[in-house]
Design a protein with these regions (language model features):
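S-adenosyl-L-methionine/SAH cofactor-binding core of RNA-modifying enzymes
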Residues: 1-56
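Rossmann-fold NAD(P)-binding glycine/threonine-rich loop
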Residues: 63
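Structured adenosyl-cofactor binding patch, chiefly the S-adenosyl-L-methionine
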Residues: 70-114
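Conserved nucleotide-binding/hydrolysis micro-motifs of P-loop NTPases
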Residues: 35, 66-68
Length: 114
């Protein structure tokens, strides 16, 4: 197991890599355990609001197993907590994609599985 200092160094290094991929015009949404959780309907409204506000270039940022660096959290325009549980990175990507798909179904008043 890594020490607290080593974990911080790992998060900072991951954070630098993440921030290097984020463009200035992106609306950044960080997946953060300390943020507010949303229902699917609230998430749909959030996505819709971003479109209305002209934020069509949204970057969802998923941290590693240690979470996100403070620099990434500071860069985020918004933070969301999907769950207090830990998920494998690849699985969470699918879960996030499914929620984005569901959000657009809700916006269009189309049926979706509850």
């Amino acid at each position: 197991n890594a020490s607290e200092k080593e974990e911080l160094q790992i998060k900072d290094k991951e954070g630098e890599l993440i921030l290097s991929k984020i463009k200035d015009n992106m609306f950044v949404v960080a997946m953060d355990l300390n943020a507010k959780q949303m229902t699917s309907e609230e998430f749909s409204k959030f996505i819709e609001t971003q479109g209305v506000m002209g934020n069509s270039n949204i970057a969802f940022v998923i941290g590693g197993s240690l979470g996100l660096s403070q620099n990434v959290i500071k860069r985020a325009n918004h933070k969301i907590c999907f769950s207090k549980m830990t998920f494998p990175h690849q699985l969470f990507r699918v879960m996030l994609l499914e929620q984005i798909y569901r959000a657009f179904r809700i916006m269009k008043n189309e049926p979706y599985h509850k």
